[in-house]
């Protein structure tokens, strides 16, 4: 085989606008009712096929490790900045599984530039994995022209669900071949009903220099007797009901607050900044609040950078489409 060109994209993060536990499954997971929106806090991923077997992954921080460490007020070797380059990284796992499934020769060279923090509940690792599958498929098609394009959707969706519950969301609506920003997810998060937002969503996100274990958060959860429903939120986001009628919810927020003392200050500061619907995303520790406009979000984020107690990554964000555009060099 010959080496392919470089394929690149910008994997986005996500926010859980709603997350409720419906039941505990026999496989250890929970049945969920969750609403996810992709946001423009992005990593950068570059992939190409090589003649050398395996996945050679290089990782760096886009803004530089020194700069990010200064924002977080931690040392440069702090675990918050450490990103694995072996099969603990979902990018490596995704490309290895793609190689096995398609029976490809050779391997992969990958450059991952991080912006999305780990242990934040923002789906950064899952988004990177989904993008790796998309880029890997495109690169494989370049060097193996007999690879049927008709197998793409089935293959990528199957591998994505195998790699992680959030990974299929970041592939977007492959079946309908359309760009979307939002999805209502059920099952363990892999059963997706995609939709387009009636209006762009603006928010401010705080990652309060703390990583929270997803497994520990879920282990402290209890399934409510009367779960809340996402129906009103879904209607509002799609423009079917007035936006003033919706409320956000995260069943994981209370147990996560018990695991990290950094979550409460983030929620409190977001509320004091004049933003609305302050909540944690996913299993934490990142928290967010909604803004009326990109200008309000930018002003609030700037204020929070000077008032938040301790280190944090604070960003104004807005909704974006999935999947991200692929570039070839």
From Swiss-Prot:
What EC number(s) are associated with this protein in UniProt? 2.7.1.148
Quote the Gene3D superfamilies the UniProt record gives.
3.30.230.10, GHMP kinase, C-terminal domain (3.30.70.890)
Which of the seven top EC classes does this enzyme belong to? transferase
Q: Specify the pathway.
A: Isoprenoid biosynthesis; isopentenyl diphosphate biosynthesis via DXP pathway; isopentenyl diphosphate from 1-deoxy-D-xylulose 5-phosphate: step 3/6
Could you tell me the keywords of this UniProt record?
ATP-binding, Isoprene biosynthesis, Kinase, Nucleotide-binding, Transferase
Q: List the cysteine pairs that form cystine.
A: none
**Highest taxon, organism lineage:** Bacteria
Where do the catalytic residues lie?
A: 14, 166
UniProt-listed GO biological process terms: isopentenyl diphosphate biosynthetic process, methylerythritol 4-phosphate pathway; terpenoid biosynthetic process
One term of GO molecular function:
4-(cytidine 5'-diphospho)-2-C-methyl-D-erythritol kinase activity
Binding-site positions, ATP: 117-127
The reactions it catalyses are: 4-CDP-2-C-methyl-D-erythritol + ATP = 4-CDP-2-C-methyl-D-erythritol 2-phosphate + ADP + H(+)
Keyword Transcription in record: no
The keyword Kinase appears for this protein: yes
Family per record: Belongs to the GHMP kinase family. IspE subfamily.
The record's section on HAMAP family has: IspE
What's its job?
Catalyzes the phosphorylation of the position 2 hydroxy group of 4-diphosphocytidyl-2C-methyl-D-erythritol.
The entry's protein name is: 4-diphosphocytidyl-2-C-methyl-D-erythritol kinase
Phylogenetic classification of the source organism: Bacteria, Pseudomonadati, Planctomycetota, Planctomycetia, Pirellulales
């Amino acid at each position: 085989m010959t080496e392919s060109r470089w394929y690149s994209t910008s994997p986005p993060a996500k926010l859980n606008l709603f997350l409720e536990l419906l039941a505990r499954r026999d496989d250890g997971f929970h049945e969920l009712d969750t609403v996810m929106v992709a946001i423009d806090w992005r990593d950068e991923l570059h992939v190409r096929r090589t003649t050398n077997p395996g996945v050679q992954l290089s990782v760096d921080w886009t803004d530089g490790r020194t700069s990010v460490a200064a924002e977080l007020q931690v040392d440069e070797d702090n675990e918050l900045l450490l990103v694995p380059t072996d099969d603990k990284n979902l990018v490596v796992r995704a490309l290895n599984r793609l190689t096995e499934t398609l029976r490809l020769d050779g391997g992969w060279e990958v450059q991952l530039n991080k912006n999305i923090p780990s242990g934040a509940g923002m789906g950064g690792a899952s988004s990177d994995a989904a993008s790796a599958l998309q880029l890997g498929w495109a690169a494989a098609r370049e060097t193996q022209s007999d690879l049927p394009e008709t197998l793409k959707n089935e293959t990528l969706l199957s591998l994505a669900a195998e790699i992680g519950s959030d990974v299929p969301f970041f592939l977007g609506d492959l079946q309908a071949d359309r760009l979307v920003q939002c999805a209502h997810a059920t099952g363990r998060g892999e059963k997706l009903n995609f939709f387009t937002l009636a209006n762009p969503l603006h928010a401010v996100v705080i990652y309060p220099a703390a990583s929270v274990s997803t497994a520990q958060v879920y282990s402290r959860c209890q399934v409510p007797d009367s779960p809340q429903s996402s129906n009103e939120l879904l209607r509002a986001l799609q423009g079917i009901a007035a936006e003033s009628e919706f409320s956000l919810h995260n069943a994981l927020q209370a147990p996560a607050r018990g695991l990290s003392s950094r979550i409460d200050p983030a929620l409190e500061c977001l509320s004091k900044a004049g933003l609305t619907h302050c909540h944690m995303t996913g299993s934490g520790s990142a928290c967010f609040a909604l803004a009326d406009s990109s200008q309000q979000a930018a002003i609030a984020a700037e204020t929070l950078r000077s008032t938040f107690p301790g280190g944090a990554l604070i960003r104004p964000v807005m909704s974006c489409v999935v999947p991200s555009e692929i570039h070839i060099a």
